[in-house]
Swiss-Prot record:
The keyword Signal applies. The gene is CRRSP35. Residues 36-138, 146-255 form the Gnk2-homologous domain. PANTHER family: CYSTEINE-RICH REPEAT SECRETORY PROTEIN 29-RELATED, CYSTEINE-RICH REPEAT SECRETORY PROTEIN 38-RELATED. Transmembrane segments: none annotated. Keywords: Repeat, Secreted, Signal. One of its GO terms (cellular component) is extracellular region. InterPro entries: CRR_secretory_protein (IPR050581), GNK2 (IPR002902), GNK2_sf (IPR038408). Residues 1-29 form the signal peptide. This is Putative cysteine-rich repeat secretory protein 35.
Length: 258
């Protein structure tokens, strides 16, 4: 069963389960959830058979990943050569590093195996992380991927002056870009993340944005996301743009760990 929940043309539908996290619930509940959001199987990379070299390389790499502390919330690792090589890219949300990141990775790798059975490549998004698995080793730093993106919005409309709300929201997001695009070094790894809140009359706006640690031009990516918001989220109380390179979200309620 599918909803008409807003998605970009690049990824057309999202299961109705994926919108549950956007419904207003208690802050403690939101902080504990890690909802599945979306996925895409890279069909062009082919499939593997049980026991072949690709599966062995994937298992070796997965075992290695599980041994990392993931303090910086990011991982880009490869194993093997040629068509049987495996690359894993993991980016955890800025408030979900360390053990929370490892937990999200475990959820994501299991979800990938269920939803992209025997596919050699694909991407899967959860609330607290996204995971890319591929036979292709991208040149580093990675270029911005504008193709594999999608949008989601809060089902509730802004009750008054939606145009003014949209403008103030985007003005605030552009200010956050300045902070997010300036790297913070965690465990020798650059992280690009910012979160903030802003008073809007009697209500408060909460927002976050983040770039994958291995991409070029974080600022360009985040500003592109902001320009995409009118296509999905005008007049809505919350919205988000997600992709392989960067993502952002805003709501009228807190949704991050403190």
């Amino acid at each position: 069963m599918y909803s008409s929940y807003s998605l970009s043309k690049r990824l057309i539908y999202v299961p109705i389960l994926a919108i549950q996290f956007l419904l207003v619930r208690s802050v403690s509940s939101l902080n504990l959830t890690n909802e599945y959001l979306n996925h895409k199987c890279f069909v062009s990379e082919g499939k593997y058979k049980h026991g072949d070299k690709y599966e062995n390389n994937l298992n070796v790499l997965n075992k290695n990943v599980l041994s990392y502390d993931l303090t910086s919330g990011f991982l880009h690792v490869s194993h093997g050569e040629g068509p049987d090589s495996v690359t894993i890219i993991l980016q955890c949300r800025g408030d979900s590093f360390g053990s929370n990141c490892r937990s999200c990775y475990t959820t994501a790798i299991d979800g990938f195996h269920r939803r992209c059975q025997r596919n050699k490549g694909g991407i899967i998004w959860y609330d607290q992380c996204f995971l890319v698995i591929s036979t292709i080793k991208p040149q580093l730093p990675r270029k911005i991927d504008f193709k594999n993106t999608f949008s989601m919005h809060n089902p509730n409309n802004v009750s008054s002056e939606p145009g003014s709300f949209d403008k103030m929201t985007r003005d605030f997001l552009y200010k956050l870009v300045q902070k997010a695009s300036y790297p913070t070094v965690v465990e020798h790894q650059s992280t690009y993340y910012a979160a903030g809140e802003k008073k809007l009359g009697k209500r408060k706006l909460y927002a976050m944005m983040q770039c994958a640690s291995d991409i070029l031009q974080c600022k360009v990516c985040l500003e592109w996301c902001i320009r995409e918001l009118p296509k999905c989220c005008d007049g809505k109380q919350g919205g988000r743009i997600l992709g392989m390179s960067c993502n952002l979200r805003y709501e009228l309620y807190p949704f991050l760990r403190r």
